[in-house]
Design a protein with these regions (language model features):
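Core segments of cupin and vicinal oxygen chelate
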Residues: 1-2, 8-49
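Vicinal oxygen chelate
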Residues: 3-13, 31-32, 41-44, 61-125, ...
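A short alpha-helix capping/helix-coil boundary motif
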Residues: 21, 59-62, 91
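Generic beta-structure capping elements
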Residues: 46, 55-57, 124
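Arg/Lys-rich, alpha-helical DNA-contact motif
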Residues: 48-52, 63
Length: 125
């Protein structure tokens, strides 16, 4: 059997990225320096094996590829979740997300992290 273990993304400001993902509901695990001199932080969502690895490198400029689509998280109550994020100062898009939820079965919204990575939010029961 094969398991999806983690996703690594490069970040320009480790503390800003950690703070952003903590606001999304991730929990911070280990932080360490790699042998190559990178700073690493490991974040996870409770109940998930898959984790997010943030990597800051003194020798690398972060540039999110234009064609990188997004990662996605699932929440039980997307309206309450998005309200919480907006109250914390995180922009939810598209801008009319609340109106879009009044019709159709699929409820989704997006946020953008400090480096430009998109995170899709889907309602899942």
């Amino acid at each position: 059997m094969i398991h999806f273990l983690h996703t690594r993304i490069r970040v320009a400001d480790m503390e800003a990225s950690i703070a952003f993902y903590l606001q999304l509901g991730f929990e911070l695990g280990e932080q360490k320096d790699s042998p190559a001199g990178n700073k690493l932080a490991f974040l996870h969502l409770p109940g998930n094996e898959h984790f997010l690895e943030l990597c800051w490198s003194p020798d690398y400029e972060v540039a999110v590829p234009e064609d990188l689509m997004h990662t996605a998280v699932g929440v039980q109550d997307i309206i309450s979740y998005c309200d919480k994020l907006e109250n914390a100062g995180i922009e939810i898009w598209p801008s009319a997300w609340r109106e879009k939820f009044s019709s159709g079965k699929r409820k989704m919204a997006f946020v953008t992290d400090p480096d430009g990575y998109e995170v899709e939010i889907l309602e899942r029961s």
